[in-house]
Curated annotation (Swiss-Prot):
CDD domains: AdoMet_MTases. It comes from the Bacteria. InterPro entries: CFA/CMAS, Methyltransf_25, SAM-dependent_MTases_sf. Pfam families: Methyltransf_25. This is Uncharacterized protein HI_1273.
Amino acid sequence: MTIYDINFAELYQQHLIACNHYNLPPIKWDKKAVKMAENLVGKPSAYNQQLLQAMNVQTDEAVLDIGCGPGTFAVPLAQQGSTVYALDYSNGMLDCLAQFKQKFGLHHLTTFHKSWADNWDDVPQADVVLASRSTLVDDLDDMIEKLCAKAKKRVFLTSVTQRHFLDEGVFEAIGREDIGFPTYIYLLNRLYQKGIQANLNFIETESGCFQGESYEDLLASVEFSLGELSEKEKQGLKAFYDRKQANNEPISHGQKKWALIWWNVDRI
């Protein structure tokens, strides 16, 4: 067998089946929307700065921001005068974005309440298509088809490089074996198989440390990703937290590095 015999879309889906917590319902993001808006929109970030520089969006270019969240990129892009179509499946995120739109008078910003799985016939094409940290999809081929259908000039995606957003020690502490998320390499290889020779860079981030002050904060972050823990699992997590505190060791959540995948669209 060679790499040409592997269907990376099928292999990706097999990985998803083995990964039982990859697809979070929108209500979970609704509850995090206000906090994310406070922490992300308009705040200095090495990740945001590097991605904006890579995209180099001009004021006369339109952008489709897929998985826009509370407006991390939609707001600054609209503020510079670009037309922005912002798409998210969380009403809570879109509500936060609507407040920024009103606050800053962003008349060139339009929102769409949609997921990757929805019909996108009414979503406009754009010069630049962005999917930042929103590429853990159900169907890799469907995502690629949508990206190619909507992009006029350039596509920019960021995808995970680590299999977990949680500290690896969490899983041992609670006694769970977990295969984790499929990483960027599936997407990169499937793009190649679809005839797209994408560019690959990496973005270093400030992530990687637990952002919270208590065991309750840690429990909340773990249950956000994994669902409700059993009492035995909570005991294991508490012991893990106490040990880290006693040894003054950080709890490393998040992706320390993101894969930036991008390409120019060749429209004949």
